Amino acid sequence: MSSEHKRSLPAVTLAAIGVVYGDIGTSPLYTLRECLSGQFGFGVEPDSVFGFLSLIFWLLVLVVSLKYLTYVMRADNAGEGGILTLMSLAGRNTSDRMTSVLVIMGLIGGSFFYGEVVITPAISVMSAMEGLEIAAPSMDSYIVPLSIVVLTLLFIIQKHGTGSVGKLFAPVMLIWFLTLGVLGARSIIANPEVLQALNPMYAVRFFIEYKAVSFFALGAVVLAITGVEALYADMGHFGKFPIRLAWFTVVLPSLVLNYFGQGALLLKNPEAIKNPFFLLAPDWALIPLMILATLATIIASQAVISGVFSLTRQAVRLGYLPPMRIVHTSDMESGQIYIPAINWMLYIAVVIVIVSFEHSSNLAAAYGIAVTGTMVITSILFCTVAVKNWLWNRYLAWVLLAGLLVIDVPMFLANVVKILSGGWLPLALGMVMFIIMTTWKSERFRLLRRLHEHGNSLDAMIASLEKSPPTRVPGTAVYFSRATRVIPFALLHNLKHNKILHERVVLLTMRTEDAPYVLNARRVTVEQLSPTFWRVIANYGWRETPDVEEVFQRCWQDGLTCQMMETSFFMSNESLIIGERPWYLRLRGKLFMMLSRNALRAADQFEIPPNRLIELGIQVEI
């Protein structure tokens, strides 16, 4: 490790604390309260307190420390993580049929994230505001309005970026975790017997004593690990080692101290179950703690919002969502983006959820099913990568998968039973996103295949045009082409109606590769097809923004000179009509047409100057 890297490690680790662990770091606000609130029939008695504390501790160890930090984070694509990245890795060395299954699983996992992201800001901020019930009971009726005000401000500032205020995230979250640890340690010192719950036998006894009821209680325990996917998804921003270092040195000790501190408080004063987190603090510290908790939940919400922006960009670039406007809010950091459509749809959904559920306890029932569903899918995809990509011993990989699913599946099933009491919300939101993603991908493929089937051979067309050239006009024309062997429809229609060609014709294909970045050496390929025709293929990673001007600069190195303001850009604009289909495919076709109408135009994606653009319409039956 270089000295430069050593100097930067503390800063990167601190930044990881501020972004990666926001969601899981605010879980102590409500987790133990929900476990012992009475909904599962558990009283605040020693056996249940010790049992839940033991379960929480060993979930943090087995799921976060072992599964994600030790195993899952090994699966990266050029340093990037996340469920869609894992899906792509898993499908690289498998059969077409198996790849289709893995893609569906990955899209379900991604859809679950969209369902979860609506709940996280709502439950986090409401839990912080509920400190008012302790500090000033008369302010109880203001919890919902204040939560909406805080989140409204958060969503408004998204368009300005979080670069400046983001520098405060890490120090605030560090103070938050230190506060968690101090509050918990004070309580543990007063009642150290609570540390017996570190023994896993208390978790085992919990299941033996409470039998079937203990299974349903897993639906509440899982609240302690919500946000665990962020560790993997944010790997590309901070790297594996800083994320692991932050967890083992700061986050895990602070969480364990706080959970066990709440447990010690409940053993001493069972009536503290109404809000054991805030009752850990002395009276004079309630208001400062509530302010700090609000800041921490805002940061946790910001991390989730940024995460959904990143996931959306990846889905758009990989062809699972229609193109949409993506604004870069920082000249220095490519990961800082803002997507207006997603931002405001998410805001409306969050406000509706807050108004409908009114209290964080009501939302807790909805929380968990998306998280645990994604955990199950992650385990399966990871073991597929281990066997197919890394050539692990098949039997050892299956043993590992069985061990992971022994934890994941019961937690998922325990949350499934909560569907009627709120679990339907993330499932419904996830289903909507899954339908949209699969519809866009499959119908777009169908459209491109139809265009390809009805297209003319490029080589034959060029040979014909060179042999019997039409009228030539000065200048360069760029035709955007999706398929490299078929003549673009815009070129075909230009010849058909205008009977002319420019002196130089460039067929430009913009491709997105299944990788976050593409090496500069592979960015642009230039091929001269004839004295007047060139084919240019530009390759970009899904984290990169296609730039036509950059493509032109690289073309110059290969002997092809193009100037943006001296070039005419031709694009085809498809007008879609639905052919004969079964009723359910007609519905899917109509959804695709609606998505296409609202998608960002290719000219806007590539920032083509409007006065240099010519669009030619074609009608296509789908």
From Swiss-Prot:
It catalyses: K(+)(in) + H(+)(in) = K(+)(out) + H(+)(out). It holds the Pfam family K_trans. One of its GO terms (molecular function) is symporter activity. One of its GO terms (cellular component) is plasma membrane. The keyword Heme does not apply. It is found in: Cell inner membrane. InterPro entries: K+_transporter, K_trans_C, K_trans_N, Kup. The chain crosses the membrane at residues 9-29, 49-69, 101-121, 137-157, 165-185, 212-232, 247-267, 279-299, 337-357, 363-383, 397-417, 419-439. The keyword Transmembrane helix applies. It comes from the Bacteria. Keywords: Cell inner membrane, Cell membrane, Ion transport, Membrane, Potassium, Potassium transport, Symport, Transmembrane, Transmembrane helix, Transport. It is a multi-pass membrane protein. Its main location: membrane. PANTHER family: LOW AFFINITY POTASSIUM TRANSPORT SYSTEM PROTEIN KUP, OSMOTIC STRESS POTASSIUM TRANSPORTER. HAMAP family: Kup. Responsible for the low-affinity transport of potassium into the cell. Likely operates as a K(+):H(+) symporter. Belongs to the HAK/KUP transporter (TC 2.A.72) family. This is Low affinity potassium transport system protein Kup.
